[in-house]
Amino acid sequence: MEQIYHLYITHKCGHNCPLCCNRLYDIDKLPVITVEDLKQAHTVCLTGGDPFYLLREELISIVDRLRIHYKNIQRIYIYTSGKKLWIEGAYSHWHELMQAVSGINVAPKDYGDWNRLDYLLQQPKWLEMTAQPGMSNRLYVFDDQWDTWNTISKDITLPATWQIIGRKWDKEFKTPENEHFVRLPLLY
């Protein structure tokens, strides 16, 4: 069975969501990922807080090290609210990183995140960057966000590499048997 590791790499986040699943855990007591874990991993999902709050070079370094030292890892995904995806010069800023990952999973948390996402999804270079062959991106839309998504989606056509998934706020983060929630020994 393919082993999937949700790797918590940072506490940094621009939100204070009342139902954040990270509040259910003492993050310091999560198991620390080991070399043996990484040697078994098929997929690594970088999570946190929000990995995009790290310096771009830090995030690229983590992805590069996983790719170089663990050839068995077939997929690397980054989970984000999308808040830090939009920056001035977003395409050139994130292009190298997007070439190194299998996709991004975006779960906007507030109206500002949706505005930034709306802007990005109307940028041809951004859409092209997330439409590379083999990429698999997800946009998570929570129950109370469908009206916002329906308004935004009228003006854009997402590449086939994007999947829209309805979500409910989950008070528990229970992983299936082949998935593991772990952390780095030292968080960024």
Where are these regions (language model features)?
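Canonical Radical SAM [4Fe-4S] cluster-binding loop centered on the CxxxCxxC motif
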Residues: 1-31
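Alpha-helical scaffolding within the catalytic cores
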Residues: 28-35, 87-93
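Acidic (Asp/Glu)-rich catalytic clusters
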Residues: 35-39, 70, 92-99, 124-131
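Structural recognition of alpha->loop->beta junctions
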Residues: 38-39, 89-116, 151-181
